[in-house]
Amino acid sequence: MDRRARGLLTGLFFTGCLLILGLGVPLHDAAAVSDLFAALRVTRVATGSPIASFDLKNLEGETVRSMELAGKVVLLNFWATWCGPCKGEMPSLARLQSQFDPTQFQVVTITTDMHPQGIKQFLQHLGIDLPVLFDEREDVSRSFMVRGLPTTVLITQDGRAVGRAVGPRAWDSEESVALVRHVLEGMK
């Protein structure tokens, strides 16, 4: 083999290695992430839309501001006590939360129900300790275009919605955990 052919093959070899290594990012990541979204039936929000800011009351009557969630990955779940599928997925949301450090990842539930005592009893009965915020005027629900319950939105540390699911999911599944980890790693 002459020098020119050897040089060409060497160049192709190194180019191939760089493509395979992806300069530190595996080639399968994009496909694997798409598979996670698809497996969970979570619609990807293409551009990562910034969320609208909000101030809502929690079960204790204290105001919680969306900016307090900055720096965390957030799974925002819209639900109601009259919604059977919402109540059915609540334990899986709690199990998902238990797998992550709450300073990095937070499941936050938002309801239009206006009966804090009933919600407290419901959550205590199930042994669930998740934050509940009240959307009295449904302004936040409208800003997230909630058309059916449950609706869940996945939000990055910098406040951008990257995924949306309508209907119940098994939020403690391997795919859900992997998706949250992926977002925690900065959607690399």
Residue map of PLM features:
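N-terminal targeting signals for export/organelle localization
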Residues: 1-53, 174, 188
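A short beta-strand-turn-helix
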Residues: 45-48, 53-74
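Active-site acidic short loop of glycosyltransferases
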Residues: 69-72, 102, 128-129, 146
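Short pre-active-site segment immediately N-terminal to redox-active cysteine/selenocysteine motifs
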Residues: 72-74, 78-82, 148
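Hydrophobic beta-strand core positions in alpha/beta domains
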Residues: 75-77, 109, 153-154
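Conserved redox-active cysteine motifs that mediate thiol-disulfide chemistry
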Residues: 78-95
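Thiol-based oxidoreductase modules, predominantly thioredoxin-like and allied folds used
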Residues: 104-116, 128-137
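Thiol/disulfide oxidoreductase modules built on the thioredoxin-like
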Residues: 121-129, 135-185
